[in-house]
Amino acid sequence: MAPTLKQAYRRRWWMACTAVVENLFFSAVLLGWASLLIMLKKEGFYSSLCPAENRTNTTQDEQHQWTSCDQQEKMLNLGFTIGSFLLSATTLPLGILMDRFGPRPLRLVGSACFAASCTLMALASRDTEVLSPLIFLALSLNGFAGICLTFTSLTLPNMFGNLRSTFMALMIGSYASSAITFPGIKLIYDAGVPFTVIMFTWSGLACLIFLNCALNWPAEAFPAPEEVDYTKKIKLIGLALDHKVTGDRFYTHVTIVGQRLSQKSPSLEEGADAFISSPDIPGTSEETPEKSVPFRKSLCSPIFLWSLVTMGMTQLRVIFYMGAMNKILEFIVTGGKERETNEQRQKVEETVEFYSSIFGVMQLLCLLTCPLIGYIMDWRIKDCVDAPTEGTLNENASFGDARDGASTKFTRPRYRKVQKLTNAINAFTLTNILLVGFGIACLIKNLHLQLLAFVLHTIVRGFFHSACGGLYAAVFPSNHFGTLTGLQSLISAVFALLQQLLFMAMVGPLHGDPFWVNLGLLLLSFLGFLLPSYLYYYRSRLQREYATNLVDPQKVLNTSKVAT
């Protein structure tokens, strides 16, 4: 039986910690495809496609000797293409399903699919000459399972209030760092552990995710902190008052009730409802403003549209470098010259493999740097108050002696939505500056400088996902979060398809020289500053509106009688 939302709230730290571990070892593990490809080739997957006369390489273990060829790699990469496509393209339907049914069923399905994926790979490795086609189904299930686990974990930060963006960044960081998983698995494989044992063990661990979800994840979705209070409520004559209600807020409620009593006398049949009703207290209405926002308004909002441009451009920049990195390193080492001797070829290959391994290890930086951008998104949120509304009393004003009829001294508060926009501006500006710095590092043909490019690439890859997730959680209703995030991921994946054309241009007409492609992408990177620029404009407009509504408290008390 699924736990209640209240029970899940008490277990939120356990759920968050286990979700980070689960994302790290079970989400986007296909991003470490290079290591998995080596293991699959050693196990002999599609080795039958390699005729003896076309043999390009031979790998040998204690019992078998398998051949390797271009046809084998093309077939295996086709499986990777399918799996990686599902890893990104299914985000939109998953977002719609999660908004409708909550994260629990999707997480159960995802963990089951991951276990099935590992089991299929283990079974197929027993007789690769016959069962090699199972790798397509296994990789497809792996990609689908990864996005299910990742997507559902992004709802957990809603239970952490003002730290929501920080925990969301931690979830995205563990997802981005999962590229290190297959390189780690390969180390175990190289130590002599059979591939079948590794896959069956991994499948068993995935079953623990299923069990953890069944025991701890509630059936309903996690509402945003602005939409529900997970903490204990105190019932008072049919009215749910938060135990943290401030004196000013209670004074506002009593004033409104007093104004209602001055207009009519309640009958006995009306009971206590005539004196006290939940809508009189700000933030306790049954239907929150966020719930009433139509999805079309969120979809067509300028913030979402500009985020599509920024995220699509950044995704293209990041994915192109991941796909073309080996060729870029090779061009830097050789200077564009042909390798004439076997010794030169071997030296180039060793250098490229060394730097590629460094790049793989650096993926763990995502786990360390993503919380930083989340901290930026959460900066000073806990010190903020809700926005004022026209014709109502500002809860966080300093009333002084207003209740005694004396002059009122007014204090301008810091509003939550304005602060969230400020934090988003800072986060996206920092990310875009790092992206431009990464582009400049790519233009310089220096091998050691590529280490800086590795660091900047890894940080940007974690930052821009975390910043976007924090922005969506801060600006849009929580019931739109899954669909909007899924749509953004799908459109970004379409943008990323252009990297294949850029790669073909680099190895074809440009003869392996990445300079012009990197220059074009660097210029394109400046489009990323359009989103924080619009957020700055939107924040200024919002501040003017708040300043207009921020009227004198005594005037509000006098005019509220007319409103009632």
Curated annotation (Swiss-Prot):
Recorded superkingdom: Eukaryota
Spans traversing the lipid bilayer: 20-40, 78-98, 105-124, 131-151, 165-185, 191-211, 303-323, 357-377, 424-444, 451-471, 490-510, 515-535
Keyword match Secreted: no
A molecular-function term among this protein's GO annotations: L-valine transmembrane transporter activity
Subcellular location: Cell membrane; Apical cell membrane; Endoplasmic reticulum membrane
Predominant location: membrane
Catalytic activity of the protein: D-leucine(in) = D-leucine(out); L-leucine(in) = L-leucine(out); L-isoleucine(in) = L-isoleucine(out); L-methionine(in) = L-methionine(out)
Purpose: Uniport that mediates the transport of neutral amino acids such as L-leucine, L-isoleucine, L-valine, and L-phenylalanine. The transport activity is sodium ions-independent, electroneutral and mediated by a facilitated diffusion.
Family affiliation: Belongs to the SLC43A transporter (TC 2.A.1.44) family.
Protein name (database record): Large neutral amino acids transporter small subunit 3
Provenance organism: Mus musculus
